[in-house]
Amino acid sequence: LTGRDKDGLGVGVFNAIEGRSYATLQDNETGETEKLLINSVSNFNMIVLDKNLKNNSYISFINTNVIRQGEFRDANVSGIDFDIRNKKQNYFVKGNGSFSYISEKEIAKPGYKYVIDVGKNSGNFTYDLLYQEISKRYDPTDMGFLGIFNNRSTILNIAYSTYVQSKYRNKSTSSFSVQYDRQLKPDVFANFALETGHFYLDRNFNAAQ
């Protein structure tokens, strides 16, 4: 169920129920089979609240919850996502943060993730500075995806764009970025990367990069 009211508040609600899943095991020597319960009855819930703000800004709250019958794994993840822009919409502060809580066989595993990104996104000269931190136990995978964990990253992006047309050029952009990653626990070096690029669009809208 989804909808948005006249004041710009959006609401989304999702619910699904999954039945039991079984696997059949067979002994190669005796040929005997055994039916094994691998997943119990599961209830999947999601709720999203999204509020439109002035200057094309917004703030959102998201919660996902998975409850499984018996001693199977339960999961709860709550998070916020926001994008705040000034009146001219050329500067921004955006980010997100979430907390996961996994419970399995009376063992609790809490984890967290947060991202903050500030920058300038219009004009000839644009930039942004981003910091991201993901704890070792952060786990949204019951109703989400996780590409990396136990990591913190700092990323700087800088670009200069020319929008004034010339005889052959429509617009062009030169960019530079630097990224520095460290593992959280233990605190050790993980990655360092530099990247440069150039994008060119001619008057016939042919692109080169």
Description of each model-found segment:
Residues 2-67, 129, 152-154:
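Active-site cores of enzymes that catalyze phosphoryl transfer or operate on phosphate-rich substrates
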Residues 17, 38, 47-48, 59-62, ...:
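Weak global preference for isoleucine
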Residues 2, 73-75, 88-209:
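Exposed, low-structure sequence patches enriched in small/polar residues
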Residues 23, 29-35, 65-69, 102-104, ...:
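Extracellular loop and loop/strand-boundary signature of outer-membrane beta-barrel proteins
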Residues 43-102, 171-176:
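Surface-exposed extracellular loop regions of Gram-negative outer-membrane beta-barrel proteins
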Residues 20, 30-34, 68, 79-83, ...:
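Short, low-complexity, polar/charged sequence segments that are solvent-exposed and flexible
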